[in-house]
Amino acid sequence: MRWYNARNAIIVDKERREMFTYTEEKKFTKEQVQQLFLSVNWISGNYPERLYKALMNSSTVLTVWDDQKLVGLTRVLDDTEMLAQIHYVLVDPAYQGMGIAGKMIEYIKEKYKDFMYIDGMPEDKENVPFYQKHGFSLMENGAAIQICNYENVH
């Protein structure tokens, strides 16, 4: 399957006979985003206003739709030249195992192929093999670090 830096791509999985729409258009609602994030138990879903604003101001938000239902989302922040950071890769549990996350990663890899680095930020170590399967490698001397302020945020 080829990926192009297009605004929309329709992917048909002939084996499963399923059709999903992949798009960079930010035409999702706060409620749709909140529902998706809560479906995977991500705390960000408890802050729909902030989450929506963050997504709207992100460099790339690739969403996956089953008709009118938001079933997958990937968010990327980039500096326009050298570094693109994948911050979210999530798929509704009812749609997991259908290859959606992998297709989103391949789309992002194609879009950012001219950047020096594409960083992935899996929040769970058990997701590292997924990224490795798609060509990512662990940084030898690096580690992800963060300050978590969500308990202080209202």
Give each language-model segment a name.
Residues 63, 69-78, 85-90:
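Conserved beta-strand in the GNAT
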Residues 110-123:
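Conserved GNAT acetyl-CoA-binding A-motif
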Residues 38-61:
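Active-site rim helix/loop that mediates acceptor-substrate recognition in acyltransferases
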